[in-house]
């Protein structure tokens, strides 16, 4: 037993040990002896039986009932379909049992429609009404067939009614009559039927279970959203209130963006809360049905869809996966394109798409098709005008399709055949081609070209272009493609449009004019011609620019790699390179979008092995589609819950895998995505949820006896925070009331625990992805403990950067909790509590002030600041500043006379190599951010936390300077492309350990990062401030410099003689080789060349008095902490922050120097006079080492706690 948690017993809600929780058992008051079994459901059943026998069965019944009902439903499913549930289907059933509505995003073959059809039968057998809405008549027929087949197999009868256009008149009349009178258990119609017949037939019907298959067709009439809500039991008044909330939230978002006053924000928040309470009351008083919206690739747009969020607690995602499992390759052609394609088809076999670049167009596509046909290949050309090839390909009557590589091309987007498409061939790099006068511009191409050439424009023009670009991008964000085409036509034909679209047209026109103007500038064209990523060509006397069309490449190659039930099919892409510069541009842009992207010459890959893997996946897909799923495929797709601390981290991770669907669970938002082999729900816990209590044991720690030895057990309860006064506490004085201000508006982390327990019951496994340090491990341990009884499997995942590859790797390498790290954190927290409480109470007694506090680490640090201040005040002296005729400045100390001239007494000049510094550790980053940017330690740590959570830099709490292979690759790519290959000098910088140095996660500098965010290529869940970019720039430059060759300078050291003594100066005369100084300034002054015995006239004299010793900045104090072994990367900033918060130290406004206050000086002197041995620097350093030893399993944490306890008894209690 390591700890006790109050109120966490899953049966009686009493106190329970960590051991009992981890063993998935109730507390020892409920069960005398723990029960253990391998099978989760058997364990739950056995525990229920034991609790019942003892007469203490309470909340455990809910865990049992849920699992039992799933088993029963699964039995029926097995009877009806012949299969057991997929893991994902089991999750969906659990949600339905709990009465939750949700959106299903699942790949092909996950049995969404089967599930919807089956659940409607289940509800019918319970005497409840179901309604299934599908997009088309054929699907109505198919669904009805499915339901009838299941009824027959399961030997059940329910009243099934359906309507579609192919019914005979008599059948139609009968169906309409039954619908009108509500004489049905299950109703199946198209979404068109719901839209047109709602008022006359469906408005007054109440539905218990509604299943919408294919959200896109359903949303064609956005009022279908209101219709579905009314059928589920909401009235028009409540829907209006939800609509009001949506509008208010939009206003609120605007206010927050403009950083408007608190009053308005408060007012809106109060109004939203009032409406939300009314909706909740309505839902409690009325029976509301369950809605499931299924979608493979839904792209739900518009505000109306948000009604589901406000009334049913979920948002529809898009399900569009951004996962690629593609082997990207290229060939530099040595013969004609046609011959290369012919050769490839012979090697690669059937199932290929062949894309012709847009500059070659449909004529070349026809020519290529005819050539391939003449060589005996079964191939068809597909275009917007002629799509019959698609059908032939689907029926496997042809083996290949040829089309033009454009973003909205028929075979670029309209093809989802994971079992047939094996590879894609590009007969040229997908590209945009523009004539310099921009004939027939389209909006996306104009944006693409602007994005590429803005960096070549003079600053004023660039700023104007950036504003125009941002405006046009913002305006078209929610405009569908067919409307954009109308705007483009209007520009081409010189027409006007109505309202908002005319405004868009005007901005589009300005953008086109801006580009035409820019492309007349000779200087700009020269820069384009020199650029390695764009192509400037003259064709038939006319100049053209070509830029890569990366969106089309992603879409087109993506046809070969689709998400299906069991993973992501492997695909192959081959580019025949027709333009090296555009190809370079394509690679660069792919790397910006996919950190893990790499492309190899086709000859370098093992083609036989790749084709084997491709065919193995196709076989799996066929089995899934034909319903012949072997059990092993079924187990491939698990439902999992990933828990991280912050909403930013959760959103960043979710966005790696497509546009997630969202659900509200209590105060938390859960994001859902499919990552191939997992249906992943991602949730933010909000960080620490538990802390030591204050009302039990010795300051929250029980002292027990075990085998004649003292044993310490901390008692934890959930953290509470008052929303009105901000006070944070653990123990209630009066339940639900803030002990400081009396407010009842108190947040309790218990709410988060309940929400997490609720979600935990839905999944097969839980993955805890808290920060990779002792603090993160302790949070993970708490989460593991309190969720354990609710889920069969819980694992810890650890990642040091938030990137897609790192997350996927972490999931594959999931481990158990590291108990040693937890022990170290337990010791740190208990020590902090004991010392803090004991010494603070002494301070309260002596100074009669309850705001005072003391801690072991902060005391020596306060001492340094007090001592430095003393030296500062005692060291005032005269200074004489001399500016010499060659602009050198020298300063003489303790002198106040006059000087006319000085001479060069000694001079040495030599060539010197200057090595770069290693990449940042936490302390070095805090020092530099303080020195160069004027940031406080807390501000820097918050910015670094954001950059880490948004996936831009690696974990920021580290004392390692080691660089991983991934880091070296990133540096290589950036330095080679942007500075020059000859500058790259890879360095590992030290041994590999648990952590890595702080570095960027991609080869993207600050200017490029700003551009990629502006262009929407990198989308972040929150906006970055100027300070974020400044810190990113500091980290980026320091890291890149650390991977570059040394700089070589002509170094000069000189001794200057004056009437008052000598002054030494050093610096460099010249740079011989710039090396890393290309990216970061040298840490030396530039000096003129000096000669021995040279006489130099003084041109200016300044005199002043000042202290010799300067005060510390936050950066200086942190450097000292590191040097003297006090504090750790996770505590540096907190220690300084505490001294400032307590008012022991203040920071000067302009120079940010630290000055102790009178209170601080008194507290320090009192503590040192009374408890010197307890708070000395030496003892603090020893303790830090002890905690490190606990973490490394070299010391027993109970023994360390005992030592601490004895020490406190000795020094304080006595």
From Swiss-Prot:
Segments passing through the bilayer: none
Annotated compartments: Cytoplasm
Positions of the catalytic residues: 955
Gene Ontology cellular component annotations, sorted alphabetically: cytoplasm
Cofactor: Zn(2+); Mg(2+)
EC numbers for this chain: 5.6.2.-
Cofactor note: Binds 2 zinc ions per subunit.
Stored Pfam families: DEAD, Topoisom_bac, Toprim, zf_Rg
Annotated Toprim domain residues: 639-802
Annotated Topo IA-type catalytic domain residues: 818-1212
Zinc fingers (RG C-terminal-type), renumbered ranges: 719-748
Enzyme class, UniProt record, top EC level: isomerase
Keywords: ATP-binding, Cytoplasm, DNA-binding, Isomerase, Magnesium, Metal-binding, Nucleotide-binding, Repeat, Topoisomerase, Zinc, Zinc-finger
Sequence segments annotated as region (Topoisomerase I): 635-1214
Zn finger limits (RG N-terminal-type): 1-37
Domain notes from UniProt: Introduction of positive supercoils requires the cooperation of both domains. The helicase-like domain probably does not directly unwind DNA, but more likely acts by driving ATP-dependent conformational changes within the whole enzyme. A beta hairpin in the 'latch' region of the N-terminal domain plays a regulatory role in the enzyme, repressing topoisomerase activity in the absence of ATP and preventing the enzyme from acting as an ATP-independent relaxing enzyme; it also helps to coordinate nucleotide hydrolysis by the ATPase domain with the supercoiling activity of the topoisomerase domain.
UniProt cross-references to PANTHER family, sorted A to Z: REVERSE GYRASE
Described purpose of this protein according to its UniProt entry: Modifies the topological state of DNA by introducing positive supercoils in an ATP-dependent process. Increases the linking number in steps of +1. Binds to single-stranded DNA, transiently cleaves and then rejoins the ends, introducing a positive supercoil in the process. The scissile phosphodiester is attacked by the catalytic tyrosine of the enzyme, resulting in the formation of a DNA-(5'-phosphotyrosyl)-enzyme intermediate. Probably involved in rewinding DNA strands in regions of the chromosome that have opened up to allow replication, transcription, DNA repair and/or for DNA protection.
Protein's recorded name: Reverse gyrase
